[in-house]
Curated annotation (Swiss-Prot):
HAMAP family: Ribosomal_bL17 (MF_01368). It is found in: Mitochondrion. The keyword Translocase does not apply. This is Large ribosomal subunit protein bL17m. The gene is mrpl17.
């Protein structure tokens, strides 16, 4: 039974899970946006909001609690000088989780977690510039077919090809293009 379960287990033992979340909170403070799996992002949201709430108190106890939690001490000044002031009037909800599709290798759901009110490039522009493939959805009488268009070359790959064969084919095309240019 799952009564009273407060945190997802994430397939790890408790000490490994807590260390992973501490490390991810530290990286989130440093970069203000990270990409991870959806389950980890949801678990991380709770911890990241808790650390910001502790930092907003700005007491000696809050400094020692944050100092013992964060894995890299170089991010502590950013937390107390920048993030604490940014979220001073906000009562909660310091992070947002944005879904980012599926990972190609194992099809696990991915997500971005970021602090709200940040100065980063908006995520729509960020994804559009860094995506290698565009997904083309084509409805057919048999069902919906998904094709992948490579943005650099404009070539379209059918979803009937397995992922492994698609990557082998991409490697072959790269070899052909380098050999033809020589």
């Amino acid at each position: 039974m799952y009564h009273g379960q407060k945190l997802a287990k994430l397939g790890r033992e408790s000490h490994h899970r807590m260390l992973m979340l501490r490390t991810m909170v530290t990286q989130l403070i440093r970069h203000e946006r990270i990409k991870t799996t959806l389950a980890k992002a949801k678990a991380l949201r709770k911890e990241a909001d808790r650390i910001i709430t502790i930092a907003k108190r700005n007491t000696r106890l809050s400094h020692s609690l944050v100092y013992s939690y964060v894995t890299d001490k170089q991010v502590i000044p950013k937390l107390f000088k920048e993030l604490r002031l940014r979220f001073g009037d906000r009562p909660g909800g310091y992070t947002r989780v944005l879904k980012a599709g599926s990972r190609l290798s194992d099809r696990s759901k991915m997500a971005y977690i970021e602090y709200v009110e940040n100065d980063l490039v908006p995520l729509r522009d960020y994804k559009a510039n860094n995506s290698k493939f565009a997904v083309i959805r084509k409805p057919t009488p048999q069902g919906t077919v998904f094709n992948f268009e490579e943005k650099e070359t404009g070539k379209i790959y059918s979803s009937a090809i397995s992922l492994n064969n698609r990557f082998k084919r991409l490697e072959q095309l790269k070899k052909q293009s380098t050999s033809s240019s020589n």
